[in-house]
Amino acid sequence: MTQATSERVIWRNARLATLNPDYSQPYGLLERHALLVRNGRIEAIVADADAPGGRSIDLEGRLVTPGLIDCHTHLIFGGSRAQEWEQRLNGVSYQTISANGGGINSTVRATRDSSEAELLALAQPRLARLLREGVTTLEIKSGYGLDLQNERKMLRVARQLADDNGVELSATLLSAHATPPEYHGDADGYISLVCETILPTLWQEGLFESVDVFCENVGFSPQQTERVFQAAQALGIPVKGHVEQLSSLGGAQLVSRYHGLSADHIEYLTEEGVAAMRESGTVAALLPGAFYFLNETRKPPVELLRKYQVPMAVATDFNPGTSPFASLHLAMNMACVKFGLTPEEAWAGVTRHAARALGRQDSHGQLAAGFVANFAIWDAEHPVEMVYEPGRAPLWGRVVRGERQ
């Protein structure tokens, strides 16, 4: 990523969709305004007529939004699950597929068998699809290595991928994603490995900034999840959780008790869980791609989230098994069509609320003075166009820390 310049640059003659809730206009729209950028941050937002002299870039009336943030991805993995998907369409159960060596274990096996260079090459085109949609920050999880060596490998690849492509990274340790084959029948033993070895070692190496757990009947129990959260808390590491996707186990309350950044999926979230999230400031991360791909029918309780004013993020959940969609615009569209969000809520979900889900709400996700100068420039009249027509992606430019990529 190029270094931010100390010279002030004026991005002028723009229509700004600031996504700043302090403005009364929908999307925080400001007509004919300019962004003053210095040292990788937005110095000020002024009316174009009031912009000072100096180095300037004329945007010719183009739309500018905050850079998009994908706050939940599993971008690094080996292998493919396409044939498995075809089997499921033909009526073969996941249990049968898994018993025959498929399912998440096939991804674990392929990821373990891949070198860092191979994983980097596989991830590059996936990331490229997100960048073409204006993404400037994304979260990438581990969770297909499931041992110290391979979890380290995944996180190293995530860092290299971000460094090579002009995008900001939020890396998450998801070692508690599934029980690896060598611990079959001993999930508690594997959680001990996570808590005592994988988590502290990779934290000391500086490879991640938050910890996630798949808390579900087919994943880890609330008790096992809490062991991981306690280990993270002891080191001062923020937590988040895959919770209430397939059943209601009280995972949202558990995440909230540890002041988690986000509770993700949450199709089976109860009102008690929503209230707990409101109290703790935990973001609801909606993942409509997985809902669609699995042909689920139970939807997240969007009306309750609105009632309790819980921020709703929207993410791709890009992964090989349940959401093979590297398109944040498609996720926004699905969130509107399937979950009932408004387009403006969907935009907030991939900007300021996604930033909050990563603990970056004070620096990312809005066009505002003092915020990091991450923004996307569009050949479009209005933000709704990207939600309405996923796949078009009329991106003119992507700016990260003040530098066009």
Curated annotation (Swiss-Prot):
NCBIfam families: hutI
GO function terms (MF aspect): imidazolonepropionase activity; iron ion binding; zinc ion binding
Purpose of the protein: Catalyzes the hydrolytic cleavage of the carbon-nitrogen bond in imidazolone-5-propanoate to yield N-formimidoyl-L-glutamate. It is the third step in the universal histidine degradation pathway.
Disulfide bonds: none
Residue positions binding Fe(3+): 72, 74, 242, 317
Gene Ontology biological process: L-histidine catabolic process to glutamate and formamide; L-histidine catabolic process to glutamate and formate
Pathway(s) annotated for this protein in UniProt: Amino-acid degradation; L-histidine degradation into L-glutamate; N-formimidoyl-L-glutamate from L-histidine: step 3/3
InterPro entries on file: Amidohydro-rel, HutI, Metal-dep_hydrolase_composite, Metal_Hydrolase
Similarity comment: family membership: Belongs to the metallo-dependent hydrolases superfamily. HutI family.
Entry annotated with the keyword DNA-binding: no
A Pfam match: Amidohydro_1
PANTHER family registered for this protein in UniProt: IMIDAZOLONEPROPIONASE, IMIDAZOLONEPROPIONASE-RELATED
Keywords: Cytoplasm, Histidine metabolism, Hydrolase, Iron, Metal-binding, Zinc
Gene3D superfamilies in the record: Metal-dependent hydrolases, Urease, subunit C, domain 1
CDD domains xref list: Imidazolone-5PH
Subcellular location: Cytoplasm
Cofactor binding note: Binds 1 zinc or iron ion per subunit.
GO cellular component, one term: cytoplasm
EC number: 3.5.2.7
Statement: the UniProt record of this protein carries the keyword Metal-binding: yes
Named cofactor requirement(s): Zn(2+); Fe(3+)
Enzymatic reactions: 4-imidazolone-5-propanoate + H2O = N-formimidoyl-L-glutamate
Binding, N-formimidoyl-L-glutamate: 144, 319, 321
Name by which UniProt lists this protein: Imidazolonepropionase
